[in-house]
Amino acid sequence: MRTKICDLLGIEFPILAFTHCRDVVAAVSKAGGYGVLGAAALTPEELDIDLAWIAEEVGGKPFGVDLIVPAKYEGSDEGGVGSKALKERIPAGHRAFVDGLMDKYDVPPLPEDRERKVNVSDAAPMSYDQAVPLMDVAFAHPISLIVNALGPPPPDMIERAHANGVKVGALAGKASHAVRHVAAGVDLIIAQGYEAGGHTGEIATMVLVPEIVDAVTPVPVLAAGGIGSGRQMAASLALGADGVWCGSIWLTTLEAETHPTVKEKFLTATSSDTLRSRSRTGKPARQLRSAWTEEWEGPDSPGTLPMPLQPLLIAEAQHRIDRAATNPQNEGAVKLANYFVGQIVGSMNESKHADRVVLDMVDEFIDAVTRVNNMME
């Protein structure tokens, strides 16, 4: 296969895999696609270790990094505010609500050493100042693409990337967003539709992709949101995209580090079992429906806080849930456990190796294109 994305990134298949698992990154890149490591939840030290491992594992194959540097967040109009000061802005009522959930669902507390670790890390970096050390680490490794997952990439991210020969990508949920990204110097656009897991906009992939393609041509566009098969890949390219950006589909692979309880939920879920909720990040993000999302939408909920206050508020609770949910006897934690995932979860009913997912997508893509071509005879 050959598209603009294949030429731009030096890959065989225009399949980009967004994942938080370094093993999936390596497997996809080695299979001819392009692995992108989601680094927002990592410390700079952890990112350094993972990128060094990936570089050695892929043997010269290309790979990239995805960060979350939102343009707007609590304290952004003040030039950024430290975690300690931000935590002081969390209302007592919200803290009481989260504590009440832990009691209601009998989620045991963390051991003291785990609790100290949570207090140090607080939450994933979701501000510019917190993301800079991650950028420093990323550019010290042989990445060829850096992506900002939420809003326009900061000017210095673009400048530093281009100075290092690294391409820059950005997600867009509207054509107007994509136009602004291109004007800022972005090299490729990820048109992410409403169906996607994580932070999404309001427009479905089928409508969004051609709108963005028309708005930013000749800049290459990746289609994202509800894509995990060769047929969906063929449809994306027919809409004008130059490749696909897939995230959810890797969460049930054998390499994935997805929480085992959550992975089992994914394997039995339908496409109706997700919703967009602010309950994890403070911004609308599609995730698996669970007792956690239901409680935040319930009549006793105080409502969610803006980013990054919501992640700071729930950091310890999420650690407690994840730790407890590994034991099926902790039924309350199992009910609460969830994670970001797109509507394609309804098709994620089998665990297989990540490289097999890539090759199956390519085979099905060929079959789909052949079928359409035969209609023209």
Name these PLM-found stretches.
Residues 1-216:
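Active-site entrance/lid segments in N-terminal catalytic domains of soluble metabolic enzymes
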Residues 81-99, 202-222, 228-377:
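Conserved active-site-proximal phosphate/metal-binding subdomains
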Residues 152, 227-228:
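Residue-level detector of alpha-helix initiation sites
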